[in-house]
Swiss-Prot record:
Transmembrane segments: none
Functional pathway: Carbohydrate biosynthesis; gluconeogenesis
Full protein name: Phosphoenolpyruvate carboxykinase [GTP]
CDD domains: PEPCK_GTP (cd00819)
PROSITE patterns per record: PEPCK_GTP (PS00505)
Length: 621
């Protein structure tokens, strides 16, 4: 049984509300969007396997996806996007707060009334010839006090099937929402309406793209893209941009962080949250396998990308992974770099923009040392290693992705769906720096840790001989994802630390790491990957009050003898290469920090400028 229709501008659009939907506000909102966008029909997604299979079959028929060889990759698919729709579009991403200063200088801002007028024009009739899918989803385990619900209205079946993997999606969410529950409304269209009888294309999209957030009303509108974070609105749009503003208002944190558990041979368990910008090995670190010399240690994965953290009754910060799947970058993922990720991808995966092998499996750069002799590349063209060498063309797009259920990860933590979250013992912040920043530093206190995170960055270009690469500052790895003024975000971190300390809680320790120092020959000086466990163990020793280290201008760094070296031949001279600090380089670095602070000066917390002055004084000169 269904109920309710709405009369659109040109025809009646059946809303077809299932009897189990009791939320009048939700029904009315769906009706308003249907009236605006004029879809042929409305489908309320129940999240079932049958629904998923039906939509995947339809997309195979539509040539949006290819079914992979069931013997090689059971129940898995490859989607190839339009070449113009392959990544997040930061320059088309807007934070439309009521006041421009609330968005701040690091976000694109348009006045809300002006943006709403633009969106109304774009969305009017945008879903003609298509189906509007109502996608109810929970970010975090249903019923968790840390979780929040969203509803995405989308005309893309690709979005529906990916959201089923990436979130808890379906009827159970509507049941939890009840008659008056709160939800974040998300509207998405690929922006390509179909005329009567018009043949659809495999990957519909529009050259005009808008990814828009209204922080005060907690709304998300996305137009023109069917890809990734532009279209899966639970991910960066909700889980970071909107959730960060919710956290600011309500006293919690939404962070671009992995969460991992570490259990010692004695059974002591620790929980770490870590923020790294893109291309810095976040997923690899989340799924780390302890190296030789660490028998009896276990690292488990709670999340690989996003963390929501709320203060518990004991004053500690408790974190959940709000996602239910991994939307990971495929290139560079291989048996050497991340065997746990590869094992996660054995079945039930949607791959996007990777290459197709002759026997119906997938391949990407970094999966194997030697590419197959013949492939179909991400644009559907024949590809051979010779073509790659001659043209520089990659078989898989550099931002090609996999969407896989987190439950399939061999290293998944037993508490990954604990509704109460896990207590965080430490935060790690890291960037990709070939010089200057040492392997690991412990901040003296919360304020200096916030300073470290606020000034972190990664090199964006290959460094010329003897020169440092251009450093892109990415505070807290949140530059593209903070939904409000970055200076206010720093203040929020500082205030939360004060609040937790006032409640008598032991604050998480804060560390800065850099796995990417290079030697004189331009080679990475630290082996990285599983060997990062050696740094992690030192942090755990410090948490327990056991670890030693040497104090310097910025905090505490371990001496050679403070790390556990069993199973790795790494000399004191090699260690000096990754931990040395050049005062001249650091004076130049602090001058770059000043440039960042100048940009954010209007609301920059005094504590950060004071911390910078203290560090300069310690550094001398």
């Amino acid at each position: 049984m269904t109920r309710s229709n709405v009369v659109a501008a040109t025809r009646t659009v059946p809303i077809d509300v299932p009897e189990y939907v009791k939320h009048r506000g939700l029904i009315d909102w769906v009706a308003r969007i249907a009236e605006l966008t004029e879809p042929d029909r409305v489908v309320w997604c129940d999240g079932s396997q049958q629904e998923y299979d039906r939509l995947c079959d339809a997309m195979v028929e539509q040539r949006t996806m290819v079914r992979l060889n069931p013997a090689k990759r059971p129940n898995s698919f490859l989607a190839l996007s339009d070449p113009s729709d392959v990544a997040r579009v930061e320059d088309r991403t807007f934070i439309c707060s009521e006041h421009r200063d609330d968005a701040g200088p690091t976000n694109h801002w348009v006045a809300p009334a002006e943006m709403r007028a633009t969106l109304n024009g774009l969305f009017r009739g945008a879903m003609r010839g298509r189906t509007l899918y109502v996608v109810p989803f929970s970010m975090g385990p249903l019923g968790s006090p840390i979780a929040h619900i969203g509803v995405e209205l989308s005309d893309s079946p690709y979005v529906v099937v990916n959201m089923r993997i990436m979130t808890r999606m379906g009827r159970a969410v509507l049941d939890a929402l009840g008659e008056r529950g709160e939800y974040v409304p998300c509207v998405h269209s690929v922006g390509r309406p179909l005329a009567a009888g018009e043949q659809d294309v495999p990957w519909p999209c529009n050259p005009t793209k808008y990814i828009v957030h209204f922080p005060e009303s907690r709304e998300i509108w996305s137009f023109g893209s069917g890809y990734g974070g532009n279209a899966l609105l639970g991910k960066k749009c909700f889980a970071l941009r909107i959730a960060s503003t919710m956290g600011r208002d309500e006293g919690w944190l939404a962070e671009h962080m992995l969460i991992l558990g570490v259990t010692s041979p004695e059974g002591r368990k620790y929980h770490i949250a870590a923020a790294f910008p893109s291309a810095c090995g976040k997923t690899n670190f989340a799924m780390l396998i302890p190296p030789k010399g660490f028998e009896g240690w276990r690292v488990t994965t709670i999340g690989d990308d996003i963390a929501w953290l709320k203060p518990g009754r004991d004053g500690r910060l408790y974190a959940i992974n709000p996602e239910a799947g991994y939307f990971g970058v495929a290139p560079g993922t291989g048996e050497k770099t991340n065997p746990n990720a590869l094992a996660t991808l054995r079945e039930n995966v949607i791959f996007t923009n990777v290459a197709l092998t002759e026997d119906g499996d997938v391949w990407w750069e970094g999966l194997t040392d030697t590419p197959p002799a013949r492939l179909t590349d991400w644009q559907g063209n024949a590809w051979t290693p010779e073509i790659g060498r001659e043209t520089g063309r990659k078989a898989a797009h550099p931002n090609s992705r996999f969407t896989a259920p987190a439950s399939q990860c061999p290293s998944i933590d037993d508490d990954w769906e604990n509704p109460g979250g896990v207590p965080i013992d430490a935060f790690i912040f890291g960037g990709r720096r070939s010089t200057t920043v040492p392997l690991v530093t412990e901040a003296r206190d919360w304020i200096e840790g916030v300073y470290m995170a606020a000034t972190m960055g990664s090199e964006t270009t290959a460094a010329a001989a003897g020169q440092q690469g251009i450093v892109r500052r990415d505070p807290f790895a949140m530059l593209p994802f903070c939904g409000y003024n970055m200076s206010d975000y720093f203040s929020h971190w500082l205030a939360l630390g004060e609040k937790l300390a006032a409640a008598g809680a032991t604050l998480p320790k804060i560390y800065c790491v850099n796995w990417f120092r290079k030697d004189a020959d331009g080679r990475f000086a630290w082996p990285g990957f599983g060997e990062n466990m050696r740094v992690l163990k030192w942090m755990l020793d410090r948490i327990d009050g056991r670890g030693e280290g040497v104090e310097h201008a910025f905090g505490v760094t371990p001496r050679y003898e403070d790390l556990h070296w069993a199973g790795l031949a790494f000399s004191p001279a090699q260690y000096a290469q990754v931990t040395s600090m050049n005062p001249d380089e650091w004076r130049a670095e602090l001058a770059l920090h000043a440039e960042l602070f100048d940009k954010l000066s209007a609301r920059l917390p005094d504590a950060l400028a004071e911390t910078k002055a203290r560090i300069e004084k310690r550094l001398g000169g």
